Amino acid sequence: MKIAIICITALLLAGTIAAQEGVEISVRTLPPSVVRTVPPAGDTEVSPSLKEIRVTFSKEMKTEKQWSWCLYSADTWPEMDVDKIHYLNDKRTCVAPVRLQAGKTYAIWINTQTYTNFRDRENNPAVPYLLVFQTRK
């Protein structure tokens, strides 16, 4: 309950500050957020033969080599072919080719407070998102 109150208070404060600064609050001006991942966050039965991780955002993104797939820990990072990361034609979905191991937990930051290269066309950085999943044995 305390966390929900803090979050609501922070949102109200942010909205008040934005309104005071004359910033229009709209889909265009607010940051993009993750709306879907493949595999889904929290999935504990991901096939180790999965060849790519996909993250879909709420808005069209800058797509020219613009992303921040970030390390949570060395133990939870998948083998990723960074030279082949790309966006789909929808300009919202970024695809990272990976090699996964069976029976392993993976955790990957999609943007962080420091690394913010996932950005929309208005240059707003995406809200950081932690993708965690586990492959089956």
Tell me the role of every PLM-derived stretch.
Residues 21-137:
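Acidic, low-complexity Ser/Thr/Gly/Pro-rich repeat segments typical of extracellular/periplasmic
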Residues 16-19:
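Sec/Tat signal peptide C-region and signal peptidase I cleavage site
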